[in-house]
């Protein structure tokens, strides 16, 4: 059975790329055609590359490899947190801090500080401090939770990194390249496939597209670690607290390409 069907990819809008004037010519091999000024991604290739990515992820998960999901744009943040949490991966969904991987020993001290503050809060130590001091500590705790909460259980740099929006997460990509960490990347038509070890040509702006692709990768991790998924294991309700509301606040019409994409979706229906 296929990992994902062409119908599922089509229904999720995975095929809609960016406006033709914003393309990266290196993506031409993954583009099927252009329609109304928007590039259309070849879903036959996407489906096959999803098969390859799924097997790669499942095999690595079976070997005990560790995964990091990275996606800080609003429409990806909540999905990143949800799917990474579901399969036991770490994630960064707010802002990539410079040196998060290449300067891990320093970042790790901040993670330890986060754990320390959480323990203090849970035990009531912060509440017993003077009001001003408690406020400062809680503010520090909140900031650390926001930026480092998704890597709190990460003991060393990951073995595989999943990237949503290659252009936005360029700093993360540079660090992965420097450390030789393989990357699975969703590649929209404005991306550069040279920076992806495992490419998945796909719309990286639409929530449904991101959800479908990341959901399948999370399934592969879960299956590699725990065995075949049961039907009840596939998905769980989205927890809004994981992304601080960014997931639901996204308005597709704010994106320059989305009005064209929306009109084309309407035509197909």
Swiss-Prot record:
State the organism named in the record.
Answer: Crocosphaera subtropica (strain ATCC 51142 / BH68) (Cyanothece sp. (strain ATCC 51142))
Which residue ranges are recorded for the region named Disordered? 228-269
Task: Please identify the protein, giving its name as recorded.
Answer: Small ribosomal subunit protein uS2
The GO terms this record gives for MF are: structural constituent of ribosome
- Signal sequence range: none
Q: Which Pfam families match?
A: Ribosomal_S2
Q: List the taxonomic lineage.
A: Bacteria, Bacillati, Cyanobacteriota, Cyanophyceae, Oscillatoriophycideae
The UniProt keywords, alphabetically, are: Ribonucleoprotein, Ribosomal protein
State the family it belongs to: Belongs to the universal ribosomal protein uS2 family.
Q: What Gene Ontology terms for biological process does this UniProt record contain?
A: translation
Q: Which GO terms describe its cellular component?
A: cytosolic small ribosomal subunit
Enumerate the InterPro entries for this protein: Ribosomal_uS2, Ribosomal_uS2_bac/mit/plastid, Ribosomal_uS2_CS, Ribosomal_uS2_flav_dom_sf
Q: Which gene encodes it?
A: rpsB
Acidic residues compositional bias: what residue ranges? 230-269
**Keyword Ribonucleoprotein (UniProt):** yes
Q: Does the keyword Zinc apply?
A: no
NCBIfam families recorded for this chain?
A: rpsB_bact
So which domain of life are we looking at?
Bacteria
């Amino acid at each position: 059975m296929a990992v994902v069907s062409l119908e599922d990819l089509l229904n999720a809008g995975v095929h809609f790329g960016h406006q033709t004037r914003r393309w990266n010519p290196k993506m031409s091999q993954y583009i099927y055609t252009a329609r109304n000024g928007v590039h259309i991604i070849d879903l036959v290739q996407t489906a096959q590359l999803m098969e390859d990515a799924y097997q790669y992820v499942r095999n690595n998960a079976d070997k005990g490899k560790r995964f990091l999901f990275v996606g800080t744009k609003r429409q990806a943040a909540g999905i990143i947190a949800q799917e990474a949490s579901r399969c036991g991966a770490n994630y960064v969904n707010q802002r990539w801090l410079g040196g998060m991987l290449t300067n891990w020993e320093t970042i790790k001290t901040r993670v330890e500080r986060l754990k320390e503050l959480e323990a203090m809060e849970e035990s009531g130590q912060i509440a017993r401090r003077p009001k001003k001091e408690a406020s400062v500590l809680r503010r520090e705790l909140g900031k650390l939770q926001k930026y480092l909460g998704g890597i709190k259980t990460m003991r060393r740099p990951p073995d595989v990194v999943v990237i949503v929006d290659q252009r936005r997460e360029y700093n993360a990509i540079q660090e992965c390249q420097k450390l030789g960490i393989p990357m699975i990347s969703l590649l929209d038509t404005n991306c550069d496939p040279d920076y992806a070890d495992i490419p998945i040509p796909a719309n990286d702006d639409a929530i449904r597209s991101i959800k479908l692709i990341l959901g399948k990768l999370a399934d592969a991790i879960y299956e590699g670690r725990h065995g075949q998924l049961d039907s009840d294991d596939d998905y769980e309700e989205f927890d809004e607290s994981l992304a601080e509301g960014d997931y639901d606040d996204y308005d597709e019409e704010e994106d320059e390409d989305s009005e064209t994409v929306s009109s084309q979706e309407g035509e197909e229906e």
